[in-house]
């Protein structure tokens, strides 16, 4: 079932339609808003530029986490195969 959730990002309200719970959407929005605020504090940026830089930073974090996950899976497989 799709839920409509209103969130506030960079002082603007947005309605998000998702199958996720409203609580989960609010959690995501709070995280994104906090990251946008951190980026906006370091430089004078338009809201659009702050959103772009936030997206780039979050994508960087995601890709690094995926790389680390892959590395740990390989390490675990190596350990398991050594025990067989």
Predicted regions and their residues:
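Residues at alpha-helix boundaries and short interhelical turns
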Residues: 43, 63-66
């Amino acid at each position: 079932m799709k839920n409509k959730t209103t969130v506030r990002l960079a002082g603007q309200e947005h309605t998000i339609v998702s199958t996720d719970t409203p609580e989960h959407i609010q959690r995501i929005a709070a995280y994104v808003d906090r990251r946008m605020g951190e980026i906006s504090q370091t430089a004078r940026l338009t809201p659009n530029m702050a959103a772009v830089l936030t997206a780039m930073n979050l994508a960087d974090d995601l890709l690094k986490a995926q790389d680390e996950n892959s590395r740990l899976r390989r390490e675990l497989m190596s350990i398991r195969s050594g025990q067989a």
